[in-house]
C-alpha cells in the first residue's frame, strides 16, 4: 500500500494511482483502447476506496508488517507451505497482535458470503486456508495474539476486523 505507515488516504491513493499509471503505460502504451481506459478508471475508483480503508485501519493502530510472506511447517505428518498476502501488526495492552490477511477479488459479496464459503452450518472450518495461515503465523510470532481474515475487493473494498481464536477453533472472522 505504498506509504506503509501513512494514515492519509490521499497520500496512499496518490501512490497507488501513480503505480497504476506506470503499470498501464508499460502494459498498454500511451494510447490504450477506450475499453482499457474505462477499466483503468474503474480500478482507480477501487484503489481510492482501498486507500480510505487502509487509512482508517492505520488510524486504528494497525500497520502493515509484512507482505507476500512465505511459510512452511509440518503438522500431523503433513507438510504445509504457502504465502500469506499480508500481515498487519498492532500493540494492544503491551501485547503484540498480528492480523493475517488474504486478499480476495470477487464481483459481489453478501454479508454471509465469507461465513458460508468457509464454515459449515455447525461452525466447523471447511476452507482451511486461514487456519493454516494462522498456524504459520503462530510460529512466526510466538506468544502473540493472531487474528485472521479476508480483505475483499470487488466494486468497493471492505475490511472488518475481528479476533479469531486459535486456528483449530471453529470460530470464524473476516476482514
Spans of model-derived segments:
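Structural signature of nuclease core domains in nucleic-acid processing machines
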Residues: 1-175
Amino acid at each position: 500500500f505504498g506509504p506503509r505507515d501513512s494514515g492519509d488516504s490521499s497520500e496512499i491513493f496518490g501512490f497507488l494511482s501513480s503505480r497504476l499509471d506506470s503499470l498501464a503505460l508499460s502494459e498498454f502504451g500511451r494510447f490504450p483502447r477506450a475499453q482499457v481506459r474505462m477499466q483503468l478508471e474503474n480500478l482507480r475508483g477501487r484503489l481510492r476506496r482501498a486507500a480510505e480503508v487502509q487509512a482508517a485501519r492505520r488510524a486504528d493502530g494497525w500497520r502493515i508488517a509484512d507482505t507476500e510472506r512465505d511459510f512452511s511447517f509440518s503438522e500431523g505428518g503433513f507438510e504445509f507451505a504457502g504465502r500469506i498476502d499480508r500481515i498487519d501488526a498492532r500493540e494492544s495492552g503491551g501485547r503484540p497482535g498480528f492480523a493475517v490477511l488474504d486478499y480476495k477479488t470477487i464481483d459481489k459479496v453478501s454479508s454471509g458470503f465469507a461465513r458460508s464459503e468457509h464454515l459449515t452450518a455447525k461452525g466447523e472450518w471447511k476452507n482451511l486456508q486461514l487456519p493454516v495461515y494462522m498456524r504459520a503465523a503462530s510460529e512466526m510470532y510466538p506468544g502473540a495474539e493472531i487474528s485472521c481474515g479476508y480483505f475483499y475487493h470487488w466494486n468497493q473494498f471492505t475490511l472488518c476486523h475481528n479476533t479469531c481464536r486459535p486456528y483449530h477453533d471453529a470460530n470464524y472472522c473476516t476482514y
